[in-house]
Amino acid sequence: MVKTYLFKKHGLMLCVTLLGLASCKKDDAILPSSDNLKAESTIGAAVDLSESAMSVGSIQSLLSGSTLQTGIVGHPFGSEPYKNISAATQIKLVKGMGMNWYRIGTLVTSTGEVTVPKLFNPLLEEAAAGNVNILPMVYLRTMDFNDTQQESYAKGKTLGANFAAKYGKYFTYYNLGNDLELDLLLPKTTGQSQAHYDRAKFNVTAAYLKGMDDGIKSKDPGAKTMIGAGWLHYGFLRMLEWYGVNYDVVAYQWYSDMENAAPKAPNNIPDITLKLSSLFPNKPIWFTEFNYRYKASYTLEQNEAAQKEFIANFLVKCRNNPQVKVAIAYELLDEPVKSFQESNYGLLKWVTPFTAFKNKISATALQLK
């Protein structure tokens, strides 16, 4: 049984995206990637799973004088690399990196029950004991594009209300869905304008999200909800506002290829944090995913150095914009059973899959000089 811990009001959260037996489509999230080759593994001094990843001082050093909080994404609900890592160890790793938010993906039934309670419940208990906040990313599992808007709203409200009724005592912030705009984009569009989206699919999605938001807040009146997008797909978030979805936080995903392309014509966006501030002046901004995308043409050492540089530089931008409240890196561990990119996103890499790992140099990226 899950103990009742009053730990939902700790402020901002660290997000590790844990997928309930599903995975994010990170390689499809934006700009096309040509890197499909596997990176070579580097063997070095390993650390056992029981050891913390990095010192708390590293992030605190980076964020000195700032109110920005940080987090990490993880996939502990069925992903192979997490099968031998206990909930206690995951929370220890989060705390060891100076983070206090862990973002997890949660699949729930229409009754609001998480599909893997034997993994979810211990994580809640360990997070409470370790003073780490969990950000649940709740999938729109019952949404159907064939539904009417009224039917979609009702389904969303039922799922949201039931989830908050069962678990609301653990959370203040709820992340509604992931990569939702990708299924709505029309071909050869950027996602900046409302004309770039399939209106029929958008209406069904927006109705579901409105219901989900209303349902959560009907059972958890103090709840704050967030909805995300990536690349230049902020048009989706603006359309949700116009539709009447009362989400509270702009959640955004940003990767190194986006950072390189955005400043160039015709985009002319040198700082995505400032662009989002101009579009959403009254909402806090959270980056619920950010990281460097490895290049197959680079050596492993070159990629790790570039990853460290991107993470450090992007966090400086976040720190310098007070509207950005939380920055969540993607992801905790390399996942070599998946794609080339998923094999390399981690701040920790495997020495002996899946029993021993060690820090990448990007694990020290959160240090400002």
Please report, for each region that a protein language model flagged, where it lies by residue.
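Aromatic- and acid-rich polysaccharide-binding/catalytic face
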Residues: 136, 178, 231-267, 284, ...
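Aromatic-lined carbohydrate-recognition surfaces of secreted/lumenal glycan-active proteins
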Residues: 206-236, 282-293, 326-334
